[in-house]
A protein has these predicted regions:
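Short, well-ordered alpha-helix to beta-strand connector turns
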Residues: 8-9, 40-41, 184
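Mid-domain catalytic core of redox enzymes
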Residues: 19-163
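A structural signal for the hydrophobic beta-strands that form the central parallel beta-sheet
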Residues: 12-14, 45, 189
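Alpha-helix termination/capping residues and helix-transition junctions
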Residues: 5-6, 37
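C-terminal catalytic lobe of FAD-dependent flavoproteins
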Residues: 149-197
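A conserved beta-strand/loop element that lines the FAD pocket in flavoprotein oxidoreductases
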Residues: 7-19
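Active-site phosphate/pyrophosphate- and oxyanion-stabilizing loops and adjacent acidic/basic residues
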Residues: 2
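Conserved beta-strand termini and adjacent loop/short-helix elements that scaffold enzyme active sites
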Residues: 15-17, 33, 190
Length: 197
């Protein structure tokens, strides 16, 4: 991104709020807070599907139908160095380690009503970052989503809340249809929801 931005010095806006986008004169008009409207040949909306849809002032029926098929859940991610959130047997450690209380056939995601976000109700996932990122084993590093018990406080490096895509039947059915809207009338879509997360 930095290399591309270096060639666009006069056209790069960091930490800028976009109010909306709309198609106009074969391109895309972007309404930028504090700057008004600026016309572009094409625009990449690198955001969640629901956020992208909210930005498109003149969304087509296909855009509304496809983008609204994707739901998101809020997860707590904790970056830490506490091995107690990994499997007890070291031989069972993998790059991705999960714990779940649900029984076979039970859903792993609960929706807290139409006004609330979907949240993971019983799934705890720990990424072994040392292995995933080829970090020196002397510096153990893990990222745990929705920890059932928090890591020891002195071993926590940061806590973050993220919205992750929920790959339910509706979302998976919508993914192959992205080609119907990708690049149409100057708008492109990018994000974890367009692929495997």
């Amino acid at each position: 991104v930095k290399r591309i931005a270096a060639h666009l010095v006069d056209r790069t806006n960091l930490n800028t709020n976009i109010r909306h986008v709309r198609r106009m004169n074969g391109g895309v008009m972007v309404n930028i807070e504090g700057q008004g409207e600026i016309w572009f040949d094409a625009v990449v909306l690198a955001a969640h599907a629901d956020q992208s849809l909210a930005l498109i002032q003149d969304a087509s029926e296909d855009e509304r139908d496809i983008l609204s098929a994707f739901q998101f859940q809020t997860n707590l991610a904790v970056l830490h160095s506490d091995a107690k959130l990994m499997p007890k047997r070291r031989g069972a450690w993998a790059a991705w380690n999960y714990v779940s209380d649900s029984l076979p056939g039970q859903p792993r995601v609960a929706n807290l009503g139409t006004a609330g976000p979907a949240v993971a109700n019983d799934l705890c996932l720990t990424y072994w970052m040392t292995r995933l990122q080829s970090i020196d084993l002397a510096y153990p590093l893990y990222e745990t989503l929705n920890p059932r018990t928090m890591p020891d406080e002195e071993l926590i490096h940061g806590e973050f809340h993220y919205r992750h895509p929920v790959f339910d039947h509706k979302a998976i059915a919508a993914q192959p249809r992205l080609g119907k809207i990708q690049g149409k009338n100057g708008l492109f879509f990018a994000g974890a929801w367009t692929g495997f997360g």
